[in-house]
């Protein structure tokens, strides 16, 4: 699982390489030299240009984008069939966000694994995902193809979509949802 902010997900007193190696050893024990090579390769696979240097750094010594790439490397080194990414780009600026999404997309496609992408950013979801499940009060209230998200029917989904800002459109107060108890049923 790739979490929202690497600053809170990575151990601050352990070098990044050691954290990734620990994950590898927990799932597929191997000799230390082999683990170092695999950690190096995992960091390179997520677009880190100098993996050997980054392996020695502590989380506070890297940028948010590099920390998130390290988190992705840590999650992928165990060879999962499914990756859960919970708001993996929300703590990143837009440029880095797109880079991280590109890395995730490539790795998921190359490895043939599934991805559950959790996000409140409906624009991002509609451009990055195949299918969308909209949840309200812990329950799925709508399932729709991402390309059809703009045609969603559930009042909660419509309310979320109506809150998205439109470039060039006049500003207006955000609509208030008239929440119904049956939405959560």
Feature annotation, model-predicted:
Residues 49-55, 143-185:
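Short catalytic/signature loops enriched in Gly
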């Amino acid at each position: 699982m790739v979490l929202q902010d690497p600053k809170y997900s990575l151990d601050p007193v352990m070098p990044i390489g050691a954290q990734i190696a620990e994950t590898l050893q927990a799932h597929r024990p191997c000799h230390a030299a082999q683990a170092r090579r695999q950690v190096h390769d995992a960091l390179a696979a997520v677009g880190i240009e100098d993996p050997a240097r980054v392996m020695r750094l502590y989380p506070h010594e890297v940028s948010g984008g590099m920390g998130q790439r390290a988190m992705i490397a840590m999650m992928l080194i165990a060879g999962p069939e499914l990756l859960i990414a919970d708001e993996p780009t929300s703590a990143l600026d837009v440029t880095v966000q797109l880079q991280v999404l590109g890395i995730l997309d490539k790795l998921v496609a190359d490895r043939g694994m599934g991805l559950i992408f959790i996000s409140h950013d409906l624009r991002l979801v509609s451009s990055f995902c195949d299918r969308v499940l909209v949840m309200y009060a812990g329950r799925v209230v709508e399932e729709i193809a991402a390309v059809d998200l703009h045609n969603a029917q559930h009042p909660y989904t419509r309310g979320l979509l109506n809150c998205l800002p439109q470039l060039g459109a006049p500003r207006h107060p955000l609509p208030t949802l008239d929440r119904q108890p049956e939405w959560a049923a």
